[in-house]
Each structure stands twice: as C-alpha cells, then as structure tokens.
Amino acid sequence: MKQNPLGILMLDTRFPRIVGDVGNAASYDFPVIFRRMEGIGSADAVAAHPDRPRVLAALKANAEALATEGAVGLGTSCGFLALYQADLAAVSPVPVATSALLHIAKLPQRRVGVI
C-alpha cells in the first residue's frame, strides 16, 4: 500500500542533518518531501523585527508546493516557526504542525522545561 508523504518546510540553513534530525530523510520510515525556503534563514524568522510578510509568503508558497507534490501534512525543521503556526495553518491546503512546542498547552498545571 502506497503511503502519502509528509512535507517538511525547511529554513535555508547549512549544517549537518544527522539521523534523528527532522531534516534528514533517514530519520523516517515513511515518505517525506523536503522544501528548503531559499533565502529564509532563522534570523529572518525570529529576529527582533522579523520580516513576517516575506517569511509568511515563503511558508505559504512552499506549503502549497508540498501539497501539490502529494504531502498530506506539514512539519518544519525549526521550532522557531511555531511563531507562524496560526498564520500558516490558515493558508495551508493541508494540516500543519510547526513545532513540538505546540504540545505545551496540553500540559495544564505541569512544569515544562524548554532548552
């Protein structure tokens, strides 16, 4: 049975993606499609004054491209993109989870440590 792929939106970064990293295809036992958002690095997304319109435009365009390529859901390579969850989910043709940090809200009355 053919599995539909997960799409991964990646910031334009250049560092080794070891097995276990979201940006390494060998980390998955199912199909994954990666899209690097050319020209959108971590500083663009989370600087003191990020260029939100440019980042959102890149997220939207690449989300649409991944959906067109068959992705049935999207994740990202950087938890910083959690800042864009609501905006991206509103325009993405498929479900989006930008960061595992989204699960913090499901831990009411618990102490959470984020490093």
Feature roles, as predicted:
Residues 54-70:
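Short, well-structured alpha-helical segments in soluble
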Residues 1-3, 66-70, 107-109:
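Flexible, charged surface loops at secondary-structure boundaries
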Residues 70-74, 93-94, 111-112:
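Short active-site oxyanion
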Residues 7-9, 111-115:
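Conserved beta-strand elements of the Class I
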